[in-house]
Amino acid sequence: MTAFIKKLLSPVVELRDSEVGTSLMMFSYSFLVMTAYTALKPVTRSKFIADMSAENLPLVQFAFGLVVGFLMQGYSAIVGRLPRRWAMPITLGGLAAMLVGFWLWFQSGSQWASTGFYFFGLILGILVISQFWTLANEVYDPRQAKRIFGFIGGGSSLGGIAGSYLTLQAKAIGTTNLLLVSAALIGLCLMLVSAIIGRERPEIKGSLTGGEDEGVGAGEALKLLKSSRHLQTIAMIIGFAAIGAAIIEQQLNMATAASKGAGNTDSITSFLGQVQLYTSIIGFVIQVWLTSKIQRYLGIGFALMILPTSLGLTGTLMLINGALWVPGLARVLDTSLRYTIDKTTREILFLPLPNDLKQQVKPFVDVTVDRFSKGIGALIVLVLINKTWGLGLGWQQLSWASLGMTGLWILAALRARREYRAIFRKSLDQQVVEPQSLRLSDADLSTVETLVEEQGHPNPRHVVYAIDMLESLDKRHLISPLLLSHDSPDVRARALATFLLVGVSNQPA
């Protein structure tokens, strides 16, 4: 049976006999937990809109940004008292029980149930994703991770599609009953995780909260951020992405409430699920077929421009056309691009930084700056739409804020492109990037072009370093055969080793 499964999966992933069972369970875990989460996400919005109105969503989002750190610290304190290996199964059991509890609360007709459930949904999104990858990093060593992570992570993509499809059935199932469906799915995850832990017996050392496992404190991270203009630019880009997403999400929520009727919960759930389904499918297609090609052939500068350009174009379209499909399209494009092309491109921006600096400040920039910016985005939206003390703008008029954000974002992207090239060139001179730390996704056009040019450097040490880097990026075909005739014996030896490795040792000397 194991041999059959290996052969069946061979076009997708290369598995050893001992890895088949655990990898299938990890794939199933990622699929089920993401199905449960994505099925609930539209429900959190639709229930809140029905009970508290779409205009109050930014208020609860801003409040969540203020308290999320305290909530996660409280959770960490609780699970810290539990046996580390069993913290995940106990957490999953608690989440399933809370979903049943919220289902019962909704039966009482309390409006506050919607607010509590919205908070719960935001926390759930943090926990389920971080816990899955924490377990994956403990089960697999780095060599296994390179082979297997793409496969088990694929379960999340399929789960996003399956969960979104579930929400399309809200009218048949009932919006509130989707909580019971998700509780059952999380119950299955509990059994899978228990089986994986019993089989592999991993030592769970990573964070269970999606927080900053590594790096320095916030104060020290801010000092490092102030000392690096490039880091400041990365933080600005992350901030603009979060604020732009907050504006688009609010436009979609307000437009849906106006079109479907704020009290029509099942219709709102179904429509938001439809938007989420398109987002999952298009995001999957972009990640698999477009992301690497855009970075490889068009470069990091072009990739950085895609998301702000999308924000500006859809913002303009919303000013012209008030149909519901327009904010739906804006949300699909924003989310699918943000978590594919834009996210991987931002990762490349960190590439030329020294590893110690990267490890110290990257968690702060990725997590804290993003959460802070989401809070700022919610506050901006609140000021723009509040009819009592704010500007009282409608959902279409919010696009003026998007257009202003687009201009600032494009300026930051142009600056990031210039700084990246300068810092990457400097990092080559100082050789601060470890070739073995590179990933294939780091191979954007600008990076590869610079490394190819580096083969002509008069210093042999630089040439050898460029060969190491190209080899790590799986770009051996770009290593010049002329290096076999280089004046330096070190360069000749390194080039020969590479050509022998790829079976072209007959290159002319």
Where are these regions (language model features)?
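C-terminal ends and interior cores of transmembrane alpha-helices
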Residues: 93-111, 291, 307-323
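Short inter-helical turns and helix N-cap capping residues of alpha-solenoid HEAT/ARM repeat scaffolds
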Residues: 456-459, 486-490
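C-terminal transmembrane helical hairpin of 12-TM major facilitator-type secondary transporters
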Residues: 302-341
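Intracellular loop-helix junctions on the cytosolic face of multi-pass helical membrane proteins
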Residues: 1-24, 54-58, 81-86, 93-96, ...
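Substrate-agnostic recognition of the 12-TM MFS/MFS-like secondary transporter fold
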Residues: 22-75, 113-168, 213-224, 229, ...
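A membrane-interface helix-boundary motif in multi-pass transporters
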Residues: 83-87, 166-185, 267, 298-305, ...
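Amphipathic alpha-helical scaffolding segments comprising HEAT/armadillo-like alpha-solenoid repeats
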Residues: 445-454, 473-485, 504-509
